[in-house]
Amino acid sequence: MLSPKKQKYRKAQKGRVASKAKAGTMIAFGEFGLKSLDSCRITSRQIEAARRAAVRCMKRQGKFWINIFPSIPVSKKPTEVRMGKGKGATEFFAARVAVGRILFELDGVSEGIAIKALELAGAKLPVRTKIVKRYE
């Protein structure tokens, strides 16, 4: 699973996800991409599950790019713990994804396989997605 090697701060504030993506809205590497239609926080586990589903469908042919990185530490307190006494330990890492952001790209496979792989990857994510083609 993806996680940052080094962090400037151990814990982060909750923050909000931007409504529209300012960058990363165009396909940069591959021929097909998976674009987000909602804004959401995606965990490293969800990214890994989507990657595995897509790569398995592609039968390890072609190339697959992940365009988002889970750099935000999300902390959580144990259940049935009283208020106060600190923020809680880091539970997982997440990436903030805005509307219009390209999440994954792939290349080197036929259009049918690419669409099927990206549909499987999109089913693993908590956002509505759409498959886009380069130059479309």
UniProtKB/Swiss-Prot annotation:
Stored InterPro entries: Ribosomal_uL16, Ribosomal_uL16_bact-type, Ribosomal_uL16_CS, Ribosomal_uL16_dom, Ribosomal_uL16_sf
A GO MF term: rRNA binding
Keywords: Ribonucleoprotein, Ribosomal protein, RNA-binding, rRNA-binding, tRNA-binding
Protein's GO biological process: translation
Any coiled-coil regions, as ranges: none
PANTHER family from the UniProt entry: 50S/60S RIBOSOMAL PROTEIN L16 (PTHR12220), LARGE RIBOSOMAL SUBUNIT PROTEIN UL16M (PTHR12220:SF13)
Biological role: Binds 23S rRNA and is also seen to make contacts with the A and possibly P site tRNAs.
Subunit structure: Part of the 50S ribosomal subunit.
Name recorded for this polypeptide: Large ribosomal subunit protein uL16
Organism of this sequence: Orientia tsutsugamushi (strain Ikeda)
